[in-house]
Swiss-Prot record:
It catalyses: acetaldehyde + NAD(+) + CoA = acetyl-CoA + NADH + H(+). It comes from the Bacteria. The active site is at C129 (acyl-thioester intermediate). CDD domains: ALDH_C. NAD(+) binds at S9, G10, N11, I12, S160, A161, G162, P163, G164, T165, R166, A167, N168, N288. GO terms for molecular function: acetaldehyde dehydrogenase (acetylating) activity; NAD binding. This is Acetaldehyde dehydrogenase 2. GO terms for biological process: catabolic process. Gene3D superfamilies: Dihydrodipicolinate Reductase, domain 2 (3.30.360.10), NAD(P)-binding Rossmann-like Domain (3.40.50.720). SUPFAM superfamilies: Glyceraldehyde-3-phosphate dehydrogenase-like, C-terminal domain, NAD(P)-binding Rossmann-fold domains. The keyword NAD applies. InterPro entries: Acetaldehyde_dehydrogenase, Acetylaldehyde_DH_C, NAD(P)-bd_dom_sf, Semialdehyde_DH_NAD-bd. Belongs to the acetaldehyde dehydrogenase family.
Amino acid sequence: MRKVAIIGSGNIGTDLMIKVLRVSDLLEVAAMVGIDPDSDGLARARRLKVQTTHEGVEGLLALDEFDEIDIVFDATSAGAHIKNAETLRKFGKYLVDLTPAAIGPFVVPAVNLTDQLNRNVDNVNMVTCGGQATIPIVAAVSQVTPVAYAEIVASISSKSAGPGTRANIDEFTETTAQAIESVGGAARGKAIIILNPADPPVIMRDTVLCLTGDVDQDAVRDSVSTMVEEVSRYVPGYHLKQEVQFDRVSAADVRTLLPAGVGTVSTQISVFLEVEGAAHYLPAYAGNLDIMTSAALRVGEGIAERLNHAEAPRRSRA
């Protein structure tokens, strides 16, 4: 078991802690780190016999078990992660960043986890909730045909958006758009987030629009279906809301969306998704938070597998 610390005792950090405790055979929570001694996350961690500190990263460094920790999950904010990463850099820990800070490369497990692990980077970024839900679909379409433009709309329950999410709205759109291009493969990406105030709260819904040339529709459907199945391996509540749709478009109608130099655009591909949370700590409607913690858990386990594999020859020689 690889020991991990979680920085951030809010909704995301607490849900991630409970996921590790309940479902992971590779990871062990050694510490929960916060800055509010009265937070529900720290209180819950103490009840679960997890070591805690309310003194932030400095408190983490002071813990007796710090040297035994291999992986640190950061579920704070973009600004806080920059400081946390600088503090932790010299200690040789692997950082999994659940904020939009994007110091390290983007990781979407179903798309590029193996590639990033092979690069031996020590800080990876989980993009955003909308990115984790939609970039696999953009990548699936890109595997079949060049995507000139991809636009995603993430609609989440307002009740599931805590202070961290609200503080990072601008970073959400910028980071997600960048990852649509660099991970999803689109020539240009755009991201929109909607906080839905409906009560009772609705689950996360995502729309992915891709502009392409003429396409083999069956090949796109198969690629999207395969990708949805892959994501659902670590996010069970992830599924298509309806069949993939194809519409003819005029290049003149979409010319303002397209970057220079792309080929002929004739088709709009529309994919509609729902993400229901596992309700480990958060309500089932908070699929936007569940997909982040589920994806982060998958990345953490991937790092643990890599570390275990690297140590196996040394153990056998001993």
